[in-house]
Amino acid sequence: MEKKRIRDFGIVPGRVKTGKRNAITDVPGVLVGHCTVNMEENHTGVTVIVPGPDNAFAHHYTAAAYVHNGFGKSAGLVQVEELGILETPIALTNTLNVGKVWDALVDIVIEQCQHDGLEPMSINPVVGECNDCRINQIQKRAVGEKEVRQAFAAAAEEFEEGDVGAGTGTICYGMKGGIGSASRVICIGEKEYTIGVLV
């Protein structure tokens, strides 16, 4: 069954023009990849957002962080707030897998840096989380380095939304949640800018 987006039902939110895909990947260079874990009691996963074509550690993409729900267990946001840069791709997973995904990001970034002739002495992985314990047996911590690498390998401009990756076990206001994305194109003076989001 093909997954539908809200616009497929004739509902058009907002008045601002969308990008080509109406997704975060309308921002040039941004890629998204998922690895979904569906086995026995585990329904979870990991989603990675690659911020651009260059090695993030070497390029230092401009970034900011805003905490809407102070109950989260995210990693890496303090340095983003302090320095205003992103040194790694962003990963999203379930609450109890933040540490394992953080570890995998460190390994992946070290490999990328060594390939580019860099020797990082400190890396600030950014990992966001959502507690998916109502659908997923969260204590089994089913997401590890293998799944993070699979999500990286799947990273592309076209990506699935809904019940995939980090959205696999999510619930939102008592309903099944998932991954969603959108983009808008705005004009400032004569120049167009694309804003993309992934939730």
Q: Model regions: which residues?
A:
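Alpha/propeptide regions of enzymes that mature by internal proteolysis
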Residues: 1-199
